[in-house]
Amino acid sequence: MMKKGIHPEYIPCKVTCVTSGKQLEVLSTKSELRIDISSFCHPFYTGSDKITDITGRVEKFRQKYNMK
């Protein structure tokens, strides 16, 4: 059983995905949240084959610090 008076109050919260612009409502202690990525636009959930090119970033890093 929860103690009275020590827990925060949960209120409806509007969560906005800044990548897709979609919104959903959940319960939280905050009234509004902005997130970078959600299940609306993440490749795992959408099934898209968007691959991030991290090889280029690694090569830039190695060139910057003269590493092999």
UniProtKB/Swiss-Prot annotation:
InterPro entries, alphabetized: Ribosomal_bL28/bL31-like_sf, Ribosomal_bL31, Ribosomal_bL31_A, Ribosomal_bL31_sf
Cleaved signal peptide residues: none
One of the Pfam families matching this protein, by short name: Ribosomal_L31
GO molecular function terms noted in the UniProt entry: rRNA binding; structural constituent of ribosome
Listed GO CC annotations: ribonucleoprotein complex; ribosome
Gene Ontology BP annotations: translation
Alphabetized UniProt keyword annotations: Ribonucleoprotein, Ribosomal protein, RNA-binding, rRNA-binding
Family the UniProt entry places it in: Belongs to the bacterial ribosomal protein bL31 family. Type A subfamily.
Record's subunit section: Part of the 50S ribosomal subunit.
Function noted in UniProt: Binds the 23S rRNA.
Protein name: Large ribosomal subunit protein bL31
Naturally occurring in which organism (per UniProt): Helicobacter hepaticus (strain ATCC 51449 / 3B1)
Lineage, uppermost ranks: Bacteria, Pseudomonadati, Campylobacterota, Epsilonproteobacteria, Campylobacterales
Encoding gene, per UniProt annotation: rpmE
